[in-house]
């Protein structure tokens, strides 16, 4: 919601926080255990506060990001952009203005928040805590701001816009809606193709926005969008009652009466930081983190890993324990990693790596010219309980090798494998050359002979060492080349000045026989957390790796300094804000949760310079590198409390980021003779030995050949097949933009649903699509209501047959329609697996995308039935998860387990309707869940803020029922989390995603699944696990998350030994708390079984 903006002078500004102001943006997850660091702090902090604040930026692998499409980087910015677009799309006023000529922009604007707003339906709707309420000091595009009505978000949910309303949509709104649709897809799916484009849009200026409307309208639309991005907003950590907290005294009185917003100093910091920092992040669609647990001593042998570690590094579970940490590190960085580990051990430091970027080893990582590419990853690692827990995440990184002559240190050659300098040279040539000439204005890499043409500061250091201006002890005993190399390695961080802007880089030097090799690498995107004292602007804590990579400053050089050492203008900007917009003072207690966006600071800077138009072309603020050069950064500020603010500082290059997320194919490992058995073994009557068996290696080789030839039968030949051609073909479709399926997506997409003739069904699908794009609408009361009677009929065994009968009758009714939802599995599943094709279907809705595949809502072109199709990349199917089924053939275990569960179905488990395959994918057909679609439990928790305990009980009871059925069949799910539970509008639950499921007799297991959030302590501790107790632990995490809307544990320390905390303000029953405590016990043998949980008194309904 945006309040009316007045033209009153700043002195007339009044402010009232009379609604719960909740934003949509989410900075990174932060952890709260203390470690030694900075000693200089403001006296406003207690010792406990200080230690916790020091620990936060380095204790968490989410307090930094070098990955522009990770949730804690792209999401931070795109959610702000989405919030702005939603306001514009749903505001007729803004769109009406776009029909007129662009008005002269009133600038600088002023702000007044009225206290006595009329109580209207619009105002009431705006108080929904799901709506991102905005403060609007900088919106300046409307000609009559004082008379502009309050902006409201759309409140119609089940009713779609009628034709008359739809006909009034102007081109500007259509463009905004398309952009909003792309944003939602990127945020929902972490799609590289969309996110890499939107990455730059999220840091956009007016030159980076392209709309199809005429120039005048487009210019106005761009400015409206940029202005909306510059609006501050609130993101509260708790729901406030709907009352006016108009003054500081009123706020203090309220604070005394309500312990849920008490100040940081009044409660235990550990507990408070857990709560305060929770809303800053979302674990959903988190980046593909490879997690390893290894021994703490040399040679650091691996004890356990997650599935994404196997996928990222191209290894199988059978070889994990034969590898060491250094085996995964590229030879160029092994000494660096070794030194860091040894130093941490000598200094008894728990945190070993805080996000250092290093090259890693990955099979088949070659460029188009068959030149080996370096694959880069950030590394976070912590020593705990005799173990070293490591988290890798791939990052984009440009690098060049510069070879210097040993005589005069001139440049002999530059190896630019990633075309780093070439791309920038082309850009500069385009910018500085007229269209009529092709005259080259810059040098290409092979024409550079002076290192000063690449980096002034690097060149200066080399010259200073050569001429004795920089000298260290023992230098006189060393040859000049080694002295130069040592000093460059010691300094390490410089800026590159050969490009359109100064950019930070890191340099590693080695002396070869005839030359010096400089390996220069630069991160296109880097961002990290800096915690600052609100009163003095001194740095309280910061991520050490980001400080070095971005600004070239180490801990001892930055500790206790002012933030102006990094962003010189920030103090003046804060002072200007306090004077001009006093209601935005970051030290006011009522401003806890205030967010000042990147574009807000860009606009403030333009206002301070009295140059209104410079905001629209701004590319950020000036940051200061250690070498004295200025770099461009963006700053987002969040008020933690009256004493501290969080700064999320970003440096991002305006370049097209190459797809760095490619994963090595799993197929080459099929040639490994040491693999005796791959896949699952039957373990119950429901999955008897007749249905599955061991797979010998030669059969797997034949299977790989089959995936290309589409043969009807599996070869029994023992001849070894050449997989090079297979791998090359599959590598083309391995990650990111997949050629074949992208083509299908484009050609087979039916946005108008011309194939759906039935009006009622078409209306339901339209609602499904709408709710997919805006999950908050799905949980509104006129659509979402937990139906207890219906749910009880499902989960009570007595009525199982009755439900099946009702389902069959529904199928019969639907079969009379021209287009229908298919819910009955094929009689012979997989019988047409090489006949049926994906081109037989048309995509109605793109639903999701993950590390292993994609999900689409589709309609069959000929038979007109509607299903959800999950597409699994064959290349990414872990080699350990193939099974040979006598009836179904050689298939992924996910399909085999789903087919097994079909034989003895349970209503809370998603059915397999059919499957088929082609060269690149397996396609799994499943029913559409819910008449108006469904959303996952993560989104229900996120958006359904008013869910009561009884509703949570009904939802959780169904999840327990589904897991009970799995365990009864001798199957463990191994990836229980809120994202793998879908819920329809009646609260009807389905458990999904059996890609990690396995038969219990296949254990014990060494590879765990997913991220740390749901991992049991014994798993993170490196122990092999049986499966059932770990499913139980994940259920406990899930129950806590449903009830308290946050994770029970925030880091490794808490999972391994932290104490459970329960927020008393939530008024949760003792029976529920008791069940959570029973489940989340660290002693494996004392955890309850699924039957005991199912019979628990709290779950008695």
UniProtKB/Swiss-Prot annotation:
* Organism placement in taxonomy: Eukaryota, Fungi, Dikarya, Ascomycota, Saccharomycotina
Q: Which Pfam families match?
A: Pkinase
Question: Quick one: which residues bind ATP?
Answer: 847-855, 870
- Write the protein's name: Serine/threonine-protein kinase PSK2
Chief place of localization? cytoplasm
Q: What's a single GO CC term here?
A: mitochondrion
Q: Where in the cell is it found?
A: Cytoplasm
Organism expressing this protein natively: Saccharomyces cerevisiae (strain ATCC 204508 / S288c)
Any further remark recorded for this protein: Present with 2220 molecules/cell in log phase SD medium.
SMART domains attached to this UniProt entry: PAS, S_TKc
Active site annotated at which positions? 975 (proton acceptor)
């Amino acid at each position: 919601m945006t309040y009316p903006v007045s033209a009153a002078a700043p002195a007339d500004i009044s402010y009232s926080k009379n609604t719960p102001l909740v934003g949509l943006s989410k900075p990174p997850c932060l952890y709260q255990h203390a470690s030694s660091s900075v000693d200089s702090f403001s006296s406003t902090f207690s010792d406990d506060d200080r230690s916790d604040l020091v620990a936060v930026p380095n204790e968490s692998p989410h307090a930094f990001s070098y990955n522009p499409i990770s949730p804690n980087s792209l999401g931070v910015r795109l959610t702000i952009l989405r919030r702005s677009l939603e306001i514009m799309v749903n505001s007729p006023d803004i769109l009406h203005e776009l029909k007129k000529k662009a008005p002269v922009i009133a600038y600088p604007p002023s702000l007044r928040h009225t206290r006595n707003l009329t109580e209207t339906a619009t105002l009431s709707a705006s108080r929904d805590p799901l709506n991102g309420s905005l403060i609007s000091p900088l919106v300046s595009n409307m000609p009559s701001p004082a008379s502009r009505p309050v902006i409201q978000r759309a409140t119609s949910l089940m009713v779609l816009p009628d034709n008359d309303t739809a006909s009034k949509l102007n081109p500007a709104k259509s463009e905004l809606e398309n952009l909003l649709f792309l944003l939602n897809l990127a945020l929902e799916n972490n799609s590289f193709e969309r996110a890499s484009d939107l990455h730059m849009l999220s840091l956009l200026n007016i030159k980076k926005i392209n709309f199809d409307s005429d120039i005048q309208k487009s210019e106005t639309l761009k400015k409206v969008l940029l202005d909306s991005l510059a609006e501050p907003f609130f993101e509260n950590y708790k729901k406030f009652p709907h009352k006016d907290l108009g003054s500081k005294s009123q706020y203090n009185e309220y604070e005394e009466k309500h312990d849920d917003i008490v100040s940081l100093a009044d409660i235990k910091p550990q507990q408070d930081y857990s709560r305060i920092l929770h809303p800053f992040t979302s674990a959903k669609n988190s980046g593909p983190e490879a997690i390893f647990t290894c021994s703490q001593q040399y040679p650091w042998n691996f004890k356990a890993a997650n599935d994404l570690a196997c996928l990222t590094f191209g290894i199988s579970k059978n070889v994990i324990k034969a590898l060491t940490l250094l085996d995964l590190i590229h030879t160029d960085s092994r000494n660096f990693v070794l030194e860091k580990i040894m130093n941490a051990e000598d200094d008894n430091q728990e945190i070993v790596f805080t996000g250092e970027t290093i090259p890693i080893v990955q099979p088949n990582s070659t460029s188009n010219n068959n030149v080996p590419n370096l694959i880069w990853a950030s590394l976070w690692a912590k020593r705990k309980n005799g173990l070293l827990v490591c988290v890798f995440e791939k990052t984009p990184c440009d690098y060049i090798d510069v070879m210097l002559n040993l005589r005069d240190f001139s440049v002999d050659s530059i190896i630019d494998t990633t075309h780093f300098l070439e791309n920038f040279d082309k850009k500069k040539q385009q910018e500085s050359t007229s269209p009529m000439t092709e005259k080259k204005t810059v040098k290409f890499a092979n024409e550079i002979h002076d290192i000063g043409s690449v980096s002034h500061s690097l060149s200066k250091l080399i010259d200073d060492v050569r001429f004795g201006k920089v000298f260290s002890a023992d230098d006189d005993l060393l040859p000049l080349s080694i002295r130069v190399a040592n000093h460059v390695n010691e300094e390490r961080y410089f800026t590159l000045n050969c490009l359109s802007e100064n950019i930070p880089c890191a340099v590693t030097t080695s002396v070869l026989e005839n030359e010096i090799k400089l390996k220069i690498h630069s991160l296109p995107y880097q961002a990290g957390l800096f915690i600052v004292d609100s009163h003095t602007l001194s740095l309280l804590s910061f991520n050490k790796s980001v400080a070095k990579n971005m600004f070239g400053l180490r801990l001892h050089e930055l500790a206790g300094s002012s933030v102006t050492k990094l962003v010189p203008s920030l103090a003046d900007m804060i002072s200007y804000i306090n004077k001009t917009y006093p209601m935005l003072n970051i030290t006011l207690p009522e401003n806890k949760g205030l967010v000042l966006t990147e574009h807000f600071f860009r606009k403030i800077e333009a206002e301070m310079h009295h140059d209104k138009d410079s905001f629209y072309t701004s590319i950020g603020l000036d940051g200061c590198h250690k070498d004295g050069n200025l770099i461009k950064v963006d700053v987002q500020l969040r008020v933690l409390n009256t004493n501290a603010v969080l700064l999320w500082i970003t440096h991002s290059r305006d370049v097209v980021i190459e797809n760095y997320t490619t994963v090595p194919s799993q197929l080459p490992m099929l040639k490994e003779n040491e693999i005796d058995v791959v896949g699952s073994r039957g373990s119950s009557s429901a999955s008897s030995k007749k249905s599955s068996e061991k797979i010998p290696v030669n059969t797997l080789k034949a299977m790989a050949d089959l995936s290309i030839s589409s043969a009807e039968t599996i070869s029994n030949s023992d001849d070894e097949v050449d997989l090079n051609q297979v791998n090359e073909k599959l590598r083309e479709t391995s990650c990111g933009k997949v050629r074949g399926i992208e083509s299908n997506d484009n050609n087979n997409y039916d946005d108008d649903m011309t194939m759906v003739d039935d009006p009622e069904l078409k209306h339901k699908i339209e609602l499904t699509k709408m709710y997919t794009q805006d999950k908050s609408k799905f949980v509104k009361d006129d659509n979402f209501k937990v139906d207890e009677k219906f749910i009880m009929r499902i989960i009570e065994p007595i009525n199982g047959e009755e439900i099946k009968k009702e389902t069959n009758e529904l199928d019969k009714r639907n079969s009379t329609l021209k287009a229908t939802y298919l819910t009955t599995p094929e009689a012979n599943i997989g019988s047409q697996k090489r006949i049926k094709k994906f081109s037989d279907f048309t995509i109605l809705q793109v639903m999701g995308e993950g590390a292993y595949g994609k999900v689409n809502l589709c309609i069959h072109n000929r038979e007109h039935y509607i299903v959800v199709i999950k597409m699994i990349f064959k290349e990414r199917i872990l080699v350990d998860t193939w099974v040979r089924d006598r009836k179904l053939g050689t298939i992924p275990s996910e399909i085999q387990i789903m087919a097994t569960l079909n034989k003895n179905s349970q209503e809370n488990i998603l059915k397999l309707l059919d499957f088929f395959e082609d060269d690149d994918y397996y396609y799994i057909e499943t029913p559409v869940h819910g008449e108006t679609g469904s959303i996952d439990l993560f989104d229900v928790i996120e958006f359904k803020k008013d869910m009561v305990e009884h509703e949570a009980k009904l939802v959780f009871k169904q999840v327990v029922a589904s897991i009970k059925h799995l365990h009864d069949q001798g199957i463990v799910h191994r990836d229980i989390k809120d994202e793998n539970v879908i819920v329809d509008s009646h609260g009807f639950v389905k458990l999904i995603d059996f890609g990690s499921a396995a038969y219990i007799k296949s254990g014990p297991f060494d590879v765990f699944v997913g991220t740390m959030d749901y991992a049991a302590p014994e798993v993170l501790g490196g122990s092999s696990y049986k499966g059932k107790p770990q499913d139980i632990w994940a259920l406990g995490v899930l129950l806590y998350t449903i009830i308290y809307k946050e994770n029970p544990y925030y880091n490794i320390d808490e999972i391994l030994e932290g104490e459970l905390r329960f927020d008393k303000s939530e008024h949760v029953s003792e029976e529920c708390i008791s069940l959570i405590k029973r489940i989340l016990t660290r002693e494996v043998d004392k955890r309850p079984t699924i039957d005991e949980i199912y019979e628990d008194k709290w779950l008695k309904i």
